[in-house]
Every structure is written in structure tokens, then in C-alpha cells.
């Protein structure tokens, strides 16, 4: 099976997610990704020609109540305790700084 090096992709994804990975974690996660890919390749080799297709593996039934529209609070009521409103929305402080 084809082996891929996932380290660079992991570094890029971790950077975008603002995660710090140690070199040991990078090695571990790269190996785990390769193992997952290898497993999917094994699954592709399984002969399913005599298997009847299913929409879902479990029988699904809705055990919950029916959704019914109900009244809601007014926009004024929703905004009355908001510290700041901007463009008909709640304004909150920025929590992620952009890197230039």
C-alpha cells in the first residue's frame, strides 16, 4: 500500500486550528492517519457484490414529538439586555487575532 507523509499536512492543519503539536505528537498522529488510510484501503477490497444496498444500517424511526412552529420573542426583546448591537446582531469582543 502507498505510504504518505502526513507531517506537513498535520503542521498546516494544527497551525490553522491554533494547536501546538510536539514532534512526538506529529509522529503519532501521522502514523494514526496512515493506519486509517490503510484500513479504508482494506475496506475497498471487500467484495460487496452480493450485498443488498441499504439507505442506513439501522432502522430509523422518529421517537420525538412533531416539530410545530411556535411564537418567538420580538427582536427588541432579544436585544434589550445586549451590551452592544451592530447591524441587527450581537456585537462581541474579538477573541482571535489575525496574523498579518
Curated annotation (Swiss-Prot):
Q: Which reaction does it catalyse?
A: L-glutamyl-tRNA(Gln) + L-glutamine + ATP + H2O = L-glutaminyl-tRNA(Gln) + L-glutamate + ADP + phosphate + H(+); L-aspartyl-tRNA(Asn) + L-glutamine + ATP + H2O = L-asparaginyl-tRNA(Asn) + L-glutamate + ADP + phosphate + 2 H(+)
List the InterPro entries hit by this protein, alphabetically.
Asp/Glu-ADT_sf_sub_c, GatC
Keywords carried by this UniProt record: ATP-binding, Ligase, Nucleotide-binding, Protein biosynthesis
Query: EC number(s)?
Result: 6.3.5.-
> Protein biosynthesis: is it a keyword of this entry?
yes
Q: Which GO terms describe its biological process?
A: glutaminyl-tRNAGln biosynthesis via transamidation; regulation of translational fidelity; translation
Q: How does it assemble?
A: Heterotrimer of A, B and C subunits.
Protein's job: Allows the formation of correctly charged Asn-tRNA(Asn) or Gln-tRNA(Gln) through the transamidation of misacylated Asp-tRNA(Asn) or Glu-tRNA(Gln) in organisms which lack either or both of asparaginyl-tRNA or glutaminyl-tRNA synthetases. The reaction takes place in the presence of glutamine and ATP through an activated phospho-Asp-tRNA(Asn) or phospho-Glu-tRNA(Gln).
Q: What is this protein called?
A: Aspartyl/glutamyl-tRNA(Asn/Gln) amidotransferase subunit C
UniProt organism field = Dictyoglomus turgidum (strain DSM 6724 / Z-1310)
Amino acid at each position: 500500500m502507498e505510504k504518505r507523509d502526513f507531517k506537513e499536512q498535520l503542521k498546516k492543519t494544527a497551525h490553522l486550528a491554533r494547536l501546538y503539536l510536539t514532534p512526538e505528537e506529529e509522529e503519532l498522529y501521522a502514523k494514526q492517519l496512515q493506519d486509517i488510510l490503510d484500513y479504508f484501503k482494506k475496506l475497498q477490497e471487500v467484495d460487496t457484490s452480493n450485498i443488498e444496498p441499504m439507505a442506513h444500517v439501522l432502522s430509523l424511526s422518529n421517537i420525538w414529538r412533531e416539530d410545530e412552529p411556535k411564537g418567538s420573542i420580538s427582536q427588541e426583546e432579544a436585544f434589550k439586555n445586549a451590551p452592544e448591537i451592530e447591524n441587527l446582531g450581537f456585537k462581541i469582543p474579538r477573541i482571535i487575532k489575525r496574523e498579518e
